């Protein structure tokens, strides 16, 4: 497995930023992730609709899928912004779309880009992971492995050690499940699943630990798309956030075509 860090400890850019499409129009960065669903990723759906616009995928789980257990949101955002700066001209507007729990990461990236160019953060159904969310997610993953009776993870202290501790619990539960099912020879499959679980929990912990102050001074314009009546963003006044209400859809697909069209309209109509 490739190590996500360089010799000086920086996040490897080839694991945090990937260009999906090329183009001459205003660039779009999409912070999203492929956690436990086989559904198409938002970044790929955007790339097929944002005609003529270069689309980049910012993937926090890739940045956390190697030997390094934990990376802060600020460090991930800095590396993504730096790599993007090497790929695109340093002027002209840029859009950063953040999906769900990746909202804070998108705001970090947009704030960094806004230092040298107009930048807009478009947050689709933003969520702000906290201790309760991580505890619930950890319990769900443990239950998926048919284990029970696990205590809630300790999330304070050194974050790398917190992630490693959760990983050790999940690894033991996976080994027990494999043995009970006669699957001792499926180490590779379980190792991949463990890495997915670990990177997801590490990302949520990075979101929970982030002070959410980097964007408080403004710089990037912020739009929130959600079905909810409230479009609040931590550390920003309501007047600094543009709220676009999403329609209530019967479609259980969270990234239904109607939703994607509304997101794309935000990056093509300005």
Question: Where in this protein do the model-derived segments appear?
Answer:
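Conserved alpha/beta-hydrolase
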Residues: 48-65
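Gly/Ala-rich beta-loop-alpha elbow adjacent to hydrolase catalytic centers
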Residues: 97-106
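Alpha-helical structural signal in soluble globular domains
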Residues: 45-49, 109-116
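The conserved beta1-alpha1 loop
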Residues: 29-34, 99
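Helix-loop module immediately N-terminal to the HCX5R catalytic loop
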Residues: 62-92, 258-270
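Short beta-alpha junction loops
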Residues: 61-63, 100, 124-130
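The serine-hydrolase catalytic nucleophile loop
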Residues: 35-44
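Alpha/beta hydrolase fold serine-hydrolase catalytic domain that processes acyl esters and thioesters
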Residues: 2-25, 30-31, 39, 111-270
């Amino acid at each position: 497995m490739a190590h996500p860090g360089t010799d000086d400890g920086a996040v490897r850019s080839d694991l945090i930023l990937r260009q999906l499409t090329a183009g001459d129009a205003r660039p779009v960065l999409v912070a999203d992730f492929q956690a436990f669903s086989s559904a198409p990723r938002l970044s790929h759906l955007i790339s097929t609709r944002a005609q003529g616009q270069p689309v980049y995928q910012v993937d926090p789980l890739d940045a956390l899928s190697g030997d390094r257990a934990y990376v802060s949101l600020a460090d991930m955002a800095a590396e993504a912004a730096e790599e993007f700066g090497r790929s695109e001209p340093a002027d002209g507007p840029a859009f950063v779309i953040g999906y769900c729990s990746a909202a804070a990461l998108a705001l970090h990236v947009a704030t960094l880009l806004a230092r040298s160019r107009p930048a807009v953060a478009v947050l689709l159904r933003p969520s702000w992971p906290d201790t309760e969310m991580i505890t619930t997610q950890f319990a769900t993953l443990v239950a998926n492995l048919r284990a029970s009776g696990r205590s809630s993870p300790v999330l304070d202290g050194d974050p790398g050690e917190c992630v490693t501790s959760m990983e050790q619990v999940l690894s033991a539960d996976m080994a027990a499940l494999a043995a009970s099912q006669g699957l001792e020879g499926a180490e590779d499959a379980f190792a991949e699943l463990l890495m997915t679980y670990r990177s997801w929990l590490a990302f949520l912990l990075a979101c929970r630990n982030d002070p959410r102050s980097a964007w408080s001074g403004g710089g990037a314009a912020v739009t929130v798309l959600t079905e909810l009546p409230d479009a609040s963003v931590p550390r920003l006044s309501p007047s600094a956030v543009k709220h676009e209400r999403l329609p209530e859809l019967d479609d259980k697909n969270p990234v239904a075509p109607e939703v994607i069209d509304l997101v794309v309209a935000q990056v093509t109509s300005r």
